[in-house]
Structures are given as structure tokens and as C-alpha cells.
Amino acid sequence: MSNEENKVTEEELDQIIEEAEKVEAAAQEAEAELEEIGDEKDAKIAQLEAALLSSETKVKDQQDAVLRSKAEVENMRRRTEQEIDKARKYALNKFAEELLPVIDNLERAIQAADAEHEVVKPILEGVELTHKTFVDAVSKFGLKEINPEGEAFNPEFHQAMSIQESPDHESNTVMFVMQKGYELNGRVVRPAMVMVAK
């Protein structure tokens, strides 16, 4: 009986070992599956994190592009307003240039007229009134006279026609204005033609 008991025990033992091996194999298989699932989850998490980072980068780039576009539109609007303002201010420039000879001729007529002659007096008064009205009208649109007699010579506003020595004037001073200059809204339309003291 002892052999039989041993045999049974050996058979039982083999069965137990076999079952234990099956359980161990199943445990290893389950562990491998869990590891695989964990690896898949880690891979999925890494993939999702990469996608999130990529999306955040795209959003930031798009926000930057939107800000740049807004700034560009604002700059364009400001430049356009400045150009329109300049166009308004200086649209009359060519027209003003054409009117200057008329003003010059009216002034020459006033200077050349004999104010003492009775026949000429009413005509002279009419020319003076016409000149005043004309100058007032163009000054409303920003045209101003440059008459620098006695002032320091400034090449931005004056054109030196001659230079002469003069004990009565300081050096580099306008002694005489040959032709008045004009400016339109701060921009010189025609410089004053002057004689400068040496």
C-alpha cells in the first residue's frame, strides 16, 4: 500500500504541479496581457500628449498670426488716414502755385499806380480791394505769405538771389525781398526770393 499511496501521491503531485504550471502560465499570460495593455495605454497617453502639444502650438501660432494681422490692419488704417490727410492738406498745392502770379500782378499794379492822380485813385482802390479779398480767400485754405525782410536767412523758406555787404544789416540777414514766398499748410509752395546781407 505504501507504493500505491506513493503512486497516488505522485500522480496527485504531478497533477498539482501540472495545475500549478497552468496557473503560473495563466498568471504569466495575464501579466503579459496587463503589461501589453499598460504599454498600449502608455503609448496612447504619449500619443495624446503629443497631439495636445501639437494642438497647443498650432493655437499659439494662430493667435500670433491673428495679433500680427490686427496690428498690420491697424498700421494700414493709420497710414491710409495719414495719406488722406496729406492729400486733403496739399491737394490745393498746384492750384495755389497757379494763383501766385495773380497775387504778384495785383501787388505790382498797386505799387506801379500813381495814388496822387485823381483818375487812378478809384481804380487803385478797386485793385487794392480785389487784392485784399483774393489774399483773404486763399488764406482761408492755408496759403500764407512768406515776407522775411529783416529776418535771418533760412534756406528752407528763402532763395538768395544776391548777397551784398551792408553796414546797416547784420550778416546773413534778409535785406530786401524781391518776390514774396508762400507756404500752404506749413509746406513751402514758393520760397521768397531775397537779397542777403554779407
UniProtKB/Swiss-Prot annotation:
GO BP annotations listed: protein folding
CDD domains assigned to the protein according to its UniProt record, in alphabetical order: GrpE
GO cellular component: cytosol
Cross-referenced InterPro entries: GrpE (IPR000740), GrpE_coiled_coil (IPR013805), GrpE_head (IPR009012)
Keywords assigned by UniProt, alphabetized: Chaperone, Cytoplasm, Stress response
Pfam family, one: GrpE
Highest taxon of source: Bacteria
Main location: cytoplasm
GO MF term (any one): protein-folding chaperone binding
Annotated compartments: Cytoplasm
Keyword Chaperone included in the entry's annotation: yes
Function: Participates actively in the response to hyperosmotic and heat shock by preventing the aggregation of stress-denatured proteins, in association with DnaK and GrpE. It is the nucleotide exchange factor for DnaK and may function as a thermosensor. Unfolded proteins bind initially to DnaJ; upon interaction with the DnaJ-bound protein, DnaK hydrolyzes its bound ATP, resulting in the formation of a stable complex. GrpE releases ADP from DnaK; ATP binding to DnaK triggers the release of the substrate protein, thus completing the reaction cycle.
NCBIfam families for the chain: PRK14139.1, PRK14140.1, PRK14150.1
The protein's assembly and partners: Homodimer.
Family per similarity comment: Belongs to the GrpE family.
Protein name per the record: Protein GrpE
Organism of derivation: Vibrio harveyi (Beneckea harveyi)
Lineage summary: Bacteria, Pseudomonadati, Pseudomonadota, Gammaproteobacteria, Vibrionales
Primary gene name: grpE
